[in-house]
Amino acid sequence: MSRISIEQVKHVADLARLAMTDEEAELFTKQLDAIITFAEQLNELDTENVPPTSHVLDMRNVMREDEPEPGLPREEVLKNAPDQQDGQFRVPAILE
């Protein structure tokens, strides 16, 4: 027995302003039913002794220390600029 109907799929598609053919609605109904069935299987798992976690893998800081380094010379930075003025990038105005 399907847990979701074609009418429900069409209703949600209509709410999302998505155009959907009858064939697509039937396909999505089957796919959503499979997803709901899988989610119900997950609900049956015993997680009593499983500690809460926000990530599947252990998380640790893998970033290097933030150490200042000398920057590039201004001329080298500006050589790729499409437009420059007074040693700075010049960009088109976006506000009037």
Swiss-Prot record:
Gene it is expressed from: gatC
Protein's job: Allows the formation of correctly charged Asn-tRNA(Asn) or Gln-tRNA(Gln) through the transamidation of misacylated Asp-tRNA(Asn) or Glu-tRNA(Gln) in organisms which lack either or both of asparaginyl-tRNA or glutaminyl-tRNA synthetases. The reaction takes place in the presence of glutamine and ATP through an activated phospho-Asp-tRNA(Asn) or phospho-Glu-tRNA(Gln).
EC number: 6.3.5.-
Pfam families to which the protein is assigned, alphabetical: GatC
Catalysed transformations (reactions): L-glutamyl-tRNA(Gln) + L-glutamine + ATP + H2O = L-glutaminyl-tRNA(Gln) + L-glutamate + ADP + phosphate + H(+); L-aspartyl-tRNA(Asn) + L-glutamine + ATP + H2O = L-asparaginyl-tRNA(Asn) + L-glutamate + ADP + phosphate + 2 H(+)
Alphabetical UniProt keywords: ATP-binding, Ligase, Nucleotide-binding, Protein biosynthesis
Residue segments, region Disordered: 64-96
Annotated protein name in UniProt: Aspartyl/glutamyl-tRNA(Asn/Gln) amidotransferase subunit C
Keyword ATP-binding: yes
GO term, biological process aspect, one: translation
Top enzyme class: ligase
GO terms, molecular function: asparaginyl-tRNA synthase (glutamine-hydrolyzing) activity; ATP binding; glutaminyl-tRNA synthase (glutamine-hydrolyzing) activity
Organism: Geobacillus thermodenitrificans (strain NG80-2)
Keyword Transferase (UniProt): no
Lineage of source species: Bacteria, Bacillati, Bacillota, Bacilli, Bacillales
Quaternary context: Heterotrimer of A, B and C subunits.
Family that this chain belongs to: Belongs to the GatC family.
